[in-house]
Amino acid sequence: PGSRVVEAGTGTAALTSAIAHYIRPTGRVYTYEIRQEFQKNAKKNLERAGLLDVVELKEGDVTQGIEEKDLDAVILDMATPWLVIPHAYTALKGSGVLVSFSPTIDQVVKVVEALEEHGFVCVETVETLIRFMQVARGKTRPQTVMTGHTGYLTFARKAIMVQQES
């Protein structure tokens, strides 16, 4: 509760809604979407969920900058998240968290390189997948055929540079 979060890639506002529930009543989600039709649909979904009091919908491209400052977190679900890393660093408060979802490993590599270049620390990437199990006494195992899509979540924290007195 009370956190200030920027999300880029509002989509249908499913993740926006989850974040809003977590940070309310005193927090704020600023969610950016470049596609106007997605933003209209997201607004309807947020109205139905009763969450517009803690969500600010913004039509804009975060690769051009993030207006908000002193943020607790920046969450990216977009095609070119590495282009947002310098803006996220400026927008986050010290020790703020960045999370990026990428469907391809090539995107992950670009994100991690940008994070390291801009001074983020504690950079970790995990793969997300669903694997169904065949459960039977004495012979439980993963299903033989797995149809699904994997994705990758990359986490990082903004480091604060502290100058030591000499």
What is the meaning of each model-derived region?
Residues 6, 75, 99:
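N-terminal Rossmann-like NAD(P) cofactor-binding module of classical short-chain dehydrogenase/reductase
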Residues 23-24, 51, 92-96:
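Helix-to-beta-strand junctions that scaffold the AdoMet/dcAdoMet cofactor pocket
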Residues 2-11:
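Conserved class I S-adenosyl-L-methionine
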Residues 26-30, 98:
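Short beta-strand element of Class I
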Residues 12-25, 89-90:
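Conserved SAM-binding loop of SAM-dependent methyltransferases across substrates and taxa
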Residues 32-81:
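S-adenosyl-L-methionine
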Residues 156-166:
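C-terminal lobe and adjacent flexible extensions of AdoMet/dcAdoMet transferase-like proteins
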Residues 82-152:
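C-terminal substrate-binding/active-site "lid" region of AdoMet-derived donor-dependent transferases
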